[in-house]
């Protein structure tokens, strides 16, 4: 907890150094009814925008899937890798390393104009998750490869680490450009605050719904491999549908030139 508090403190200090952008907004209403009305106006604007709906759909799926995957990894570690809870938490950290790497790679390689080119990576990520369902620690011999800070990396766990790094990398690689595009469209069509409010509402609703579904499957004692396969296929199929929707939008009207336009 102390480490987390320290990180938040450092983040707050960084925020203090952010320069004033000069943006000034009119005084906001405090009437709850009017605020709710304004929120849903922004909600519909962003979902109806051809670029906004694609990026919002992807980020919404990502946060819901990401939160659920954290719990799936723990269950997978218990049933397939013979790990306890603390050992399973290490797998979550391994996945986070992949996400960070993919995010940095995307930031250095994908310009805003090319953001939508990363959509197929979401399909690949979903299919890669399905591979988790077929791997078990007993498939390979167990012997120590190397030690990192007192943590022993065994040979039969190496595929699990590599798989989670790959899944995390793909997730970070496709969500960063989508988030950048969403922030851009939100800035153009609404405002930074209204856009973030709509984004957070959708993302948290996605987290809630997907975790409820996962909890139901666990309560029904559905085998973990089936849960993992269903989860991976859901992500892959949803991303495929998003791609088809984008292609249909482009067939009707080329909206890519809107990327980079000034605020209305």
Regions found by a protein language model. Give the residues of each.
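A single, central transmembrane helix in multi-pass transporters
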Residues: 1-2, 44-101, 119, 124, ...
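Juxtamembrane intracellular "pre-TM" segments in multi-pass secondary transporters
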Residues: 20-56, 80, 145-154
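Structural signature of the two symmetry-related core transmembrane helices
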Residues: 117-132, 229-232
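Helix-loop junctions on the cytosolic side of multi-pass membrane transporters
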Residues: 4-30, 112-113, 136-140, 243-254
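C-terminal ends and interior cores of transmembrane alpha-helices
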Residues: 124-153
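Hydrophobic alpha-helical transmembrane segments
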Residues: 1-24, 93, 97-98, 125, ...
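Helix-to-loop junctions at the C-terminal end of transmembrane segments
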Residues: 101-116, 217-218
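Substrate-agnostic recognition of the 12-TM MFS/MFS-like secondary transporter fold
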Residues: 1, 5-8, 54, 62-70, ...
């Amino acid at each position: 907890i102390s480490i987390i508090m320290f990180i938040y403190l450092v983040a707050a200090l960084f925020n203090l150094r952010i320069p004033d952008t000069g943006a000034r907004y009119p005084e906001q209403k405090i009437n709850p009814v009017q605020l709710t009305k304004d929120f849903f106006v922004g909600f519909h604007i962003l979902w109806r925008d051809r670029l906004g709906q694609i990026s919002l759909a992807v980020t919404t799926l990502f946060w819901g899937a990401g939160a659920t995957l954290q719990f799936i990894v723990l269950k997978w570690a218990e049933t397939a890798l013979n790990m306890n809870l603390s050992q399973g938490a290490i797998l979550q950290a391994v996945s986070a390393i992949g996400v960070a790497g993919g995010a940095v790679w995307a930031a250095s390689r994908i310009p805003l104009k090319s953001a939508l080119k990363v959509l197929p990576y979401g399909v690949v990520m979903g299919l890669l998750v399905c591979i988790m369902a077929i791997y078990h620690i007993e498939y390979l011999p167990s012997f120590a490869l190397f030690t990192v800070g007192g943590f022993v990396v065994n040979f039969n766990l190496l595929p699990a680490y590599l798989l989670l790094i790959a899944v995390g990398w793909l997730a970070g690689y496709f969500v960063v450009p989508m988030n950048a595009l969403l922030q851009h469209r939100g800035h153009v069509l609404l405002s930074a605050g209204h856009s973030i409010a709509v984004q957070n509402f959708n993302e948290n609703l996605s987290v809630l719904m997907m975790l409820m579904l996962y909890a139901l499957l666990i309560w029904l004692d559905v085998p973990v491999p089936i849960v993992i396969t269903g989860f991976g296929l859901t992500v892959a199929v949803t991303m495929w549908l998003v791609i088809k929707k984008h292609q249909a939008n482009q067939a009707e009207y080329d909206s890519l030139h809107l990327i980079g336009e000034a605020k209305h």
